[in-house]
A protein has these predicted regions:
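Secondary-structure capping and boundary motifs in well-ordered enzyme cores
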Residues: 62, 89, 171, 175-176, ...
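Conserved ATP-binding subdomain of kinase catalytic cores across diverse folds
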Residues: 2-128, 206-207, 222, 244, ...
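All-alpha amphipathic helical-bundle segments outside canonical DNA-binding/catalytic cores
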Residues: 243-259, 290
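Active-site acidic catalytic loop and adjacent metal/ATP-binding pocket
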Residues: 1-4, 10-13, 158-206
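Generic, well-ordered alpha-helical scaffold segments in large soluble proteins
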Residues: 43, 100-103, 160, 213-216, ...
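Active-site activation/catalytic loop segments of kinase-like enzymes and analogous catalytic loops
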Residues: 38, 200, 206-243, 259-279
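ATP-dependent phospho-/nucleotidyl transfer catalytic cores
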Residues: 77-176, 188, 282-285, 294-305
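ATP/Mg2+ or Mg2+-diphosphate-binding catalytic cores
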Residues: 259-305
Length: 305
């Protein structure tokens, strides 16, 4: 399904399954392709977060074969996860999350979307069993490239992954799940951000997206100096958009808990997708930044909801 309008731009973007069989099988098991197609079909049009327009989408959920035809947002520029960003760019990116999170905050009807749910007990149990093994594999693969603070954080976190997988009773909404610079497009003509790659969207704690972006996108000095203001501004905008009963103290605690989300993603993705030179550099950088973030926030007491 898609937009039947004749007002097509000069170019469009076609998105297809990965050619690598390991990545493709991982996406099938995780329902990643289904999530992305359904997000564009069902949710993108009703949310104020900026995304490419859908022209056509279809998927065979049994095989994982899919196609998405999306508007080309050129000349927008893709962010660079390895290079990071300035505090001003981070503020734009965090502000854009309000348009994703606020409209369906604690909306029970989200549970009617099975492809968006991640509350399956069997799935959580599988992840709780799998992730410590992937962490061991990550350390073995990268050896001395895994910094001491990453080892310290990972050894503290992954044995408690089952606690982290538990969802809180409230403060849940639609989350992106991989909200980082590589998945954002920036328009030089104005202060606009567009969000792409919705293969990890889910129902989850909003602050995981915020902490994940801040922890990955800013260097340590900028993060430490600006993260309090970024969280304050996000919380104020969230309240301004109509979210009630979510105070600043709770927001900050959820942000601390969310700092672990990036380490989980860095390790899991590194071990479950096709290995590339840039991928190795990116995942090691992510692991380093996210581990330092969690340790800076003393987040070991915030693993459980």
């Amino acid at each position: 399904c898609g937009d039947d309008s004749d007002d097509l731009g000069s170019t469009v973007i076609a998105k297809l399954p990965a050619s690598d069989p390991v990545s493709r099988n991982t996406a099938l098991v995780m329902r990643s392709y289904e999530k992305e197609v359904r997000f564009y079909e069902v949710l993108a049009g009703e949310l104020p977060v900026r995304t490419p327009g859908l022209r056509y989408g279809d998927i065979d959920v049994e095989s994982g074969s899919f196609v998405l035809i999306l508007d080309d947002l050129a000349p927008a520029n893709q962010g660079d996860q390895l290079a990071g960003c300035s505090p001003d760019v981070a503020a734009l990116a965090v502000a854009e999350l309000v348009g994703l999170h606020a409209p369906r905050w604690d909306d029970p009807t989200l549970l009617d979307l099975p492809w968006l749910r991640n509350d399956d007990p069997d799935g959580r149990a599988m992840m709780a069993m799998l992730m410590p093994m992937l962490w061991d594999g990550f350390r073995d693969r990268y050896g001395d490239a895994v910094e001491d603070h990453v080892r310290m954080a990972g050894d503290a976190f992954f044995p408690r992954i089952a606690e982290f997988m538990e969802l809180p009773d409230d403060g849940r909404t639609i989350i992106h799940g991989d909200y980082r610079l590589d998945n954002l497009l920036f328009d030089d003509a104005g202060p606009t951000v567009a969000v792409v790659d919705w293969q990890t969207c889910a129902i989850g704690p909003a602050m995981h997206d915020v902490a994940y972006f801040v922890g990955a996108g800013l260097d340590e000095h900028d993060r430490r100096e600006h993260e309090g203001r970024l969280v304050d501004d996000y919380h104020g905008a969230l309240v301004g958009a109509g979210v009630a009963g979510y105070d600043r103290e709770r927001c900050w605690r959820d942000y601390r808990r969310g700092s672990w989300a990036g380490l989980l993603m860095a390790v899991g993705a590194a071990m479950m997708v096709e290995r590339t030179e840039r991928g190795d550099a990116m995942f090691l950088t992510m692991a380093s930044r996210h581990a330092r973030h969690a340790l800076d926030l003393d987040a070991t007491d915030a693993v459980a909801p």
